[in-house]
């Protein structure tokens, strides 16, 4: 399944707020939603499916990519669900988004693809690049690159930077300080339901 490129508001109306996908928050009609839910018996499969879809759309990855991350998480030590979230959160495109250097993860991915971003002083143009503690994230020393990201930082640094990241405005430098903990995830998600969804595939 390819990466979703359709209307983003339609997705968050169905799944809830997904800050990585869009910073828009649609106004929902509470009464009609409650009535719709009360008239339907939601299956356990659907509940797991929707949690899985939240991860996929929030992080902007394909079905195959998410399944691969689940398989990696299953082989790692610790809680499969927490390891899965750590793998997704440590992607370069997500790190750029969480630092406030881009308004959304698709926006961050575009910055990486267009070679605006350096990791440890080297250009990295792979959005899925897995960052690790002590990695530094900087902007290419080019006027266009600096202008784009400075504008984003002014608009989106209002969001709190998570505990595993820091950003130095004077040096225009982000730093991964540690592997994030569960409380720093910027998404309301039940990762155990996602693991259960893939239990027969991973």
From Swiss-Prot:
UniProt keywords, alphabetically: Chloroplast, Plastid, Ribonucleoprotein, Ribosomal protein, RNA-binding, rRNA-binding
Annotated GO CC locations: chloroplast; small ribosomal subunit
Record GO biological process: ribosomal small subunit biogenesis; translation
Domain S4 RNA-binding residue range list: 90-153
SUPFAM superfamilies, alphabetized: Alpha-L RNA-binding motif
Keyword Membrane: no
SMART domains from the UniProt entry: Ribosomal_S4, S4
Predominant location: plastid
GO molecular function terms listed in the Swiss-Prot or TrEMBL record: rRNA binding; structural constituent of ribosome
Cell compartments where the protein resides: Plastid, Chloroplast
Function: One of the primary rRNA binding proteins, it binds directly to 16S rRNA where it nucleates assembly of the body of the 30S subunit. With S5 and S12 plays an important role in translational accuracy.
Family of this protein: Belongs to the universal ribosomal protein uS4 family.
Record's subunit section: Part of the 30S ribosomal subunit. Contacts protein S5. The interaction surface between S4 and S5 is involved in control of translational fidelity.
Record-given protein name: Small ribosomal subunit protein uS4c
Gene: rps4
């Amino acid at each position: 399944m390819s990466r979703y490129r359709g209307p983003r508001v339609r997705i968050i109306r169905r799944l809830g707020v997904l800050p990585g996908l869009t910073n828009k928050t649609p106004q929902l009609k509470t009464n009609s939603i409650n009535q719709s839910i009360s008239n339907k018996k939601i299956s356990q499969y659907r509940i797991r499916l929707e949690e899985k879809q939240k991860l996929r759309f929030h992080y902007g990855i394909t079905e195959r990519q998410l399944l691969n991350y689940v398989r990696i998480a299953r082989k790692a030590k610790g809680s499969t669900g927490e390891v899965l979230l750590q793998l997704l959160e440590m992607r370069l495109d997500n790190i750029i988004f969480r630092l406030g250097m881009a308004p959304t993860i698709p926006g961050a991915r575009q910055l990486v693809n267009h070679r605006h971003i350096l990791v440890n002083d080297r250009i990295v143009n792979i959005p899925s690049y897995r960052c690790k503690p002590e990695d530094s994230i900087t902007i290419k020393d080019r006027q266009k690159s600096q202008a784009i990201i400075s504008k984003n930082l002014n608009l989106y640094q209002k969001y709190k930077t998570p505990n595993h990241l820091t950003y130095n405005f004077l040096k225009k430098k982000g730093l991964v300080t540690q592997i994030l903990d569960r409380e720093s995830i910027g998404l309301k998600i039940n990762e155990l339901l996602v693991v259960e969804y893939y239990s027969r595939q991973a």
